[in-house]
């Protein structure tokens, strides 16, 4: 008893002794100012009334002109900090990420429709580390990705065959729609082993992920769950959950039959499916962290949200820029002809030998990042650039603004892929897309960077190269007629979404480069 009392008193004394040290950081931060902020801050809505542009990144640019590259707002009752330079990005996402900015902000739609288990959104901790390791080591490792290369090639050839049919019939093709089908089918087959059943409902999920509600930012409304937004979340969930449940059960039946055949794979059966790996982990009783069915469902949604809309939208932007910049289109075609030739279809393995194609991908992401505003959440009060960043604050990184800033890019409004090839001795590797160059962060940076960056960029580059190799694209105007001469331009107007797509679908009549083109992808 005396020993226990002595230990208790010792712990109390030690805490009292260390308390000034433990709280010194917090106390010192109290003397620091908050980042500049507009006045006044209105009741309930905070500064939401200042977001008066159709798209968030434009409103944030206007505010940064008045309040500087680092400023604070209130989105309803939520403190929000906006950063607009690569130097600030580095402080948040590298210097202080581990201690304060390792978690993302999620809306009520994302939380519900990922079963509160999105690896992209869950707090940094043991579960996140385990799942992230599983994704990198077991799903997106080089061996698995290479085994799935024929599948990805099949999906690209499907797109090319549709384009060839349009070219032959002279019927305009909704290229935007075909790109969404391509990415959705590719991810669905890799993730689930099938392409069709989940496609339509997945689009509804992605659409609402790109929306916000006042209930996400005004705390008295969060528990009420009123309005159409919350009803739509419930409706989508009630339609999506039975579909993904059926897909999982179907996969479990396939696995059961395969075990009865001692692991033998039937002819025509897909041998590598990400869902199989997740089910293997879920059924393994020796795993330190048990994966539940809800967590598997959340990961399925993660893969769709990360790999379908963003890649399709980026590819749509790239094709539109190529149409509007025929010099770039022709230069890319000359590179493909020189490296690949005209007798076979360009392949994913060729991309490493096509630096100009890779630079087109980078230039597209510079001008049209899939996430123009990257979001994080502050989990611990922190000092950044002489200002205090409060715990719980939403952090916004205006990636779009940096991509158009003349301070960091020469002639930033021009689509000029050559900029990535002008560093002598480094080539297009001088600036990469993996979060180490803070003036170009289309996939984020640090621990929360998109793990599928290599897969996404390789797929996008391969499809672009395939289209350039095989077709010219004649733009169809609103009246359904092919545009000629100076009028043959694609509108680059943006609209809101999970990513920021073009406001109008890309409608074209493909023109086969030669009569031999269909033979390149007929098999």
UniProtKB/Swiss-Prot annotation:
Keyword hit for Glycoprotein: no
* Cellular component terms (Gene Ontology): endoplasmic reticulum; intracellular membrane-bounded organelle; membrane
Q: Quote the annotated effect of residue 104 to A.
A: Total loss of catalytic activity
Q: Which UniProt keywords apply?
A: Endoplasmic reticulum, Heme, Iron, Membrane, Metal-binding, Microsome, Monooxygenase, NADP, Oxidoreductase, Transmembrane, Transmembrane helix
The terms under GO molecular function for this entry are: 2-hydroxyisoflavanone synthase activity; heme binding; iron ion binding; oxidoreductase activity, acting on paired donors, with incorporation or reduction of molecular oxygen, NAD(P)H as one donor, and incorporation of one atom of oxygen
State the conditions that upregulate or repress this gene.
Up-regulated upon elicitation.
Q: Which cofactor does this sequence's record say it needs?
A: heme
EC id = 1.14.14.87
Report the locations given in the UniProt record.
Answer: Microsome membrane
- Pfam families to which the protein is assigned, alphabetical: p450 (PF00067)
Name the residues that bind heme.
Answer: 450
Q: Which InterPro entries match?
A: Cyt_P450, Cyt_P450_CS, Cyt_P450_E_grp-I, Cyt_P450_sf
Name one process (GO BP) from the record: isoflavonoid biosynthetic process
> Could you list the residue ranges that cross the membrane?
2-22
Membrane topology term: Single-pass membrane protein
Mutating residue 305 to T has which effect? No effect on catalytic activity
Q: What is its main location?
A: membrane
- Does the record bear Hydrolase in its keywords? no
General remark: Lys-375 is essential for the intramolecular aryl migration of a flavanone molecule to produce the isoflavonoid skeleton. Arg-104 and Leu-371 are essential for the correct P450 conformation.
Q: What is this protein called?
A: 2-hydroxyisoflavanone synthase
Q: What organism is listed for this UniProt entry?
A: Glycyrrhiza echinata
């Amino acid at each position: 008893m005396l020993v226990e009392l002595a230990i208790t008193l010792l712990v109390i004394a030690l805490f009292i002794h260390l308390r000034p040290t433990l709280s010194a950081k917090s106390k010192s931060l109290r003397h620091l100012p908050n980042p500049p902020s507009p006045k006044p801050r209105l009741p309930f809505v905070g500064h939401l009334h200042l977001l008066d542009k159709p798209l968030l990144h434009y409103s944030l640019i206007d505010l940064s002109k008045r309040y500087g590259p680092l400023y604070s707002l209130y989105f309803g009752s939520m403190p929000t900090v906006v950063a607009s330079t690569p130097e600030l990005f580095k402080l948040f996402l590298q210097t202080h990420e581990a201690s304060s900015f390792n978690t993302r902000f999620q809306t009520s739609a994302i939380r519900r429709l990922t079963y509160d288990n999105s690896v992209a959104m869950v707090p940094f901790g043991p579960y996140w580390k385990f799942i992230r390791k599983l994704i990198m080591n077991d799903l997106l490792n080089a061996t698995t990705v290479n085994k799935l290369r024929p599948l990805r090639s099949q999906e690209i050839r499907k797109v090319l065959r549709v384009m060839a049919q349009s070219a032959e019939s002279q019927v305009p093709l909704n290229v935007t729609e075909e790109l969404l089908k391509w990415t959705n089918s590719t991810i669905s087959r890799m993730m689930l082993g099938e392409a069709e059943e989940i496609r339509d409902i997945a689009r509804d999920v992605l659409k609402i992920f790109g929306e916000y509600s006042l209930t996400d930012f005004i705390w008295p409304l969060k528990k009420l769950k009123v309005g159409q937004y919350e009803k739509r979340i419930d409706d989508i969930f009630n339609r999506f959950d039975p579909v993904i449940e059926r897909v999982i059960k179907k996969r479990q039946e396939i696995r059961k039959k395969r075990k009865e055949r001692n692991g033998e794979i039937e002819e025509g059966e897909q041998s590598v499916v990400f869902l199989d790996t997740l089910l293997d982990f879920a059924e393994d009783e020796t795993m330190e962290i048990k994966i539940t069915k809800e967590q598997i469902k959340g990961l399925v949604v993660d893969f769709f949200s990360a790999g379908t809309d963003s890649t399709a939208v980026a590819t749509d932007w790239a094709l539109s820029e190529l149409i509007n910049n025929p010099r770039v289109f022709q230069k890319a075609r000359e590179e493909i002809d020189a490296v690949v030739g005209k007798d076979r279809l360009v392949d994913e393995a060729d991309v490493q030998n096509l630096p100009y194609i890779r630079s087109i991908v980078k230039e597209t992401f510079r001008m049209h990042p899939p996430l123009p505003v990257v979001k994080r959440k502050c989990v611990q009060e922190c000092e950044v650039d002489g200002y205090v960043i409060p715990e719980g604050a939403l952090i916004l990184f205006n990636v779009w603004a940096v991509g158009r800033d003349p301070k960091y890019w020469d002639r930033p409004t021009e689509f000029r892929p050559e900029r990535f090839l002008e560093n002598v001795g480094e080539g297009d590797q001088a600036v990469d897309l993996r979060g180490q160059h803070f003036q170009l962060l289309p996939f984020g940076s640090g621990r929360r960077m998109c793990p599928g960056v290599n897969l996404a960029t390789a797929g996008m580059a391969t499809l672009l190269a395939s289209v350039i190799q095989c077709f010219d694209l004649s733009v169809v105007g609103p009246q359904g007629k092919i545009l000629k001469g100076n009028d043959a331009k694609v509108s680059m107007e943006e609209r809101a979404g999970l990513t920021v797509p073009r406001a109008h679908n890309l409608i074209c009549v493909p023109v086969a480069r030669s009569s031999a083109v269909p033979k390149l992808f007929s098999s």
